[in-house]
Amino acid sequence: MAATVSTIGAVNRTTLNNSNYGGLVPNSAFLGSRLKVSSRFTTSKMVTGNFKIVAEQDEEKQTEKDKWRGLAFDTSDDQQDITRGKGLADPLFQAPMGTGTHNAVLSSYEYISAGLRDYSYDNNVDGFYIAPAFMDKLTVHIVKNFLTLPNIKVPLILGVWGGKGQGKSFQCELVFAKMGINPIMMSAGELESGNAGEPAKLIRQRYREAADIIKKGKMCCLFINDLDAGAGRLGGTTQYTVNNQMVNATLMNIADNPTNVQLPGMYNKEENPRVPIIVTGNDFSTLYAPLIRDGRMDKFYWAPTREDRIGICTGIFRTDGVPFEDIVKLVDTFPGQSIDFFGALRARVYDDEVRKWAVGVGVERIGRNLVNSKESPPTFDQPKMTIEKLLEYGNMLVMEQENVKRVKLVTSI
């Protein structure tokens, strides 16, 4: 049997299954400043058995006195601790949890992106319309950033701005699909965080991820939706935070040094590929003025013409069998409406079918049939869309818009 010495610094050993090999385990103990070792080998045979050494574990002796023990979990107001605020803010305003951006002890390269967008549709087959001017601007900007032009400084950022609901983001996605580009996506909600500096770090991470895709031989770009909503200043009711400043400063720095984008705390001399940045917004005058200067950002104002509106609406109603003449009449009847208006108009036509189904099932049994049913969800026959019905629902939408502008319940008190 292996002897056990219960002294300070002792190692406790478990008993071997075969007691014949007990002499093979040496005995040692610290006695003051001297070390006594007694070892006696009774046989010279090779031993193939397994034995286990078990030490008594006392976590309090180590963790309570360790000054670094709370590095990844401290909720103090220390700028080094980037985990402050984790789980306390709405996830819309933070990067995805568990991806490395909230844990101070992880390497930045352990970040796994949730922003890579994969488009599975082909706009040529599905019949979507791309405005020629829009496609020309995006194509030229992207190609210029992948070329090496002599003595030419090409703006890295393309800012597409215009009225609300005019299809800026969707037109960009169609151009990306046409060119075979899977962009790295960001939105305005990711440009603010409870942790100072995290959105700026996220921009650099997404940019370097797009650069890695380009390095592997596939075109890519960084696509930021509604930049002015996240980094702009919209009147006196909007608070300008440190993150707003750092987002603007980071984009300016990347635009000036597009091939030398480093992550915080990780610096090397290896250059990364240049990545075009496409941003959308409604009003770029709310952004920091040096960011939108011509050397850094190329601006493109998107205001669809009548031909563009007809072409886009043809794509919206492509599966409904609406004649081209009716689409032209519909566009001309509502000339001041956005592109999104016609998508909402098409959705309104299904209201009658949904109402019939709800009445037939019974209001009290709707939940049982929609979310707690073994049967498949209900399907509807495609309603016939006539120009009369479209004009009727279109006028209803216009009346609702005018009613909101006219009543103004908050300001009328």
Swiss-Prot record:
GO cellular component: chloroplast stroma
Binding, ATP: 162-169
Chief localization: plastid
MF-aspect GO terms: ATP binding; ATP hydrolysis activity
Localization: Plastid, Chloroplast stroma
Transit peptide: 1-54
Keywords from the UniProt entry: ATP-binding, Chloroplast, Nucleotide-binding, Plastid, Transit peptide
Domain of life where this protein originates: Eukaryota
Family: Belongs to the RuBisCO activase family.
Main function: Activation of RuBisCO (ribulose-1,5-bisphosphate carboxylase/oxygenase; EC 4.1.1.39) involves the ATP-dependent carboxylation of the epsilon-amino group of lysine leading to a carbamate structure.
Name the UniProt record assigns to this protein: Ribulose bisphosphate carboxylase/oxygenase activase, chloroplastic
